[in-house]
Regions:
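Conserved ABC ATPase signature
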Residues: 134-138, 142
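Helix N-cap at the start of a conserved alpha-helix in ABC-type nucleotide-binding domains
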Residues: 170-172
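Catalytic Walker B motif of ABC-type/P-loop ATPase nucleotide-binding domains
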Residues: 159-162
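Conserved ABC ATPase "signature" region
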Residues: 64, 111-129
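Conserved ABC transporter NBD signature motif
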Residues: 56-64
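Helix-to-loop junction immediately C-terminal to a conserved catalytic motif
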Residues: 48
Length: 251
């Protein structure tokens, strides 16, 4: 189980995360949702150690990740897959080279073993025929799928996704959401996604946490959202639905 206890984080004197305590569901698709600027991205990056909390703790099972040194954290990070917003692919590397990078950096596997794993992951995201392409030759949805393949190439226990469907059209967003959720279920991964997209919540969210102004305002299942007695959350749901409708009309 991944959990946070009383996480506080400030930037330039402004408190971005304020006393955040959450228990994420093991082997499930967990979503951190909220308006832009609510602290969702900062929380996600704090969970993986890209930001250090001013106070509070992040736990992986019975291990206090926050209190670990660099070497000890490195061992846990081997179990973490990360999908960065925009994909964060290396422009000068092919698709298969991008996916293989974690294996090159963190394992002593033979080249044959690495390529077997790379090919398996590319097949899983349905990009086996794009292995020799470069990022500039890919669509937005293909870039996201390469990022997913790279994130799972080390067979992680935990998968963190920073707005994985940002910049995508509604149909492609659904494809990416479903792919991440399928992988979560198939391999029993604990997945945590930061998103502003209510469609993601209603389609794949097994547990969702709503942040507002850096505080946890609500948590529950997608079924609970429909009956939530929380005006701020209800306003967010309505605004998200209207924004989605406007985008579809514009397209």
């Amino acid at each position: 189980m991944i959990r946070t206890e009383h996480i506080v984080k400030s930037f330039d004197g402004r408190r971005v995360l304020d006393d955040i305590s959450i228990e994420f569901e093991t082997g499930k698709t967990n979503l951190i949702i909220g308006r832009s600027g609510s602290g969702t991205t900062v929380l996600l990056k704090t969970l993986v150690g890209l930001h250090e909390p001013d106070s509070g703790d992040v736990w992986y099972d019975e291990v206090n990740f926050t209190r670990l040194g660099f070497r000890e954290r490195k061992e846990i990070r081997k179990d973490i897959g990360m999908i960065f917003q925009g994909g964060a692919l290396l422009d000068s590397s092919t698709v298969e080279e991008n996916v293989k990078l974690p294996l090159d950096l963190f394992t002593s596997k033979s080249e044959r073993e690495k390529m077997e794993r790379v090919n398996f992951c590319l097949q899983r995201v349905r990009l086996e025929n794009a292995n020799r392409l470069y990022p500039a030759e890919l669509s937005g949805g293909m870039i996201k799928r390469v990022a997913i393949a790279r994130a799972i190439v080390m067979n992680p226990r935990y998968l963190f996704c920073d707005e994985p469907n940002s910049g995508l059209d509604p149909q492609t967003s659904i494809v990416i959401d479903n792919l991440i959720h399928e992988i979560t279920e198939e391999y029993g991964i604990t997945t945590i996604i930061n998103t502003h997209d209510m469609n993601s919540v209603m389609e794949i969210g097994e547990k969702s946490v709503y942040l507002h102004g850096g505080r946890k305002w609500w948590e529950g299942t997608k079924e609970d959202i429909l009956h939530a007695d929380n005006r701020e959350l209800n306003d967010f749901v309505f605004a998200s639905a209207m924004a989605k409708r406007a985008k579809r009309v514009a397209e």
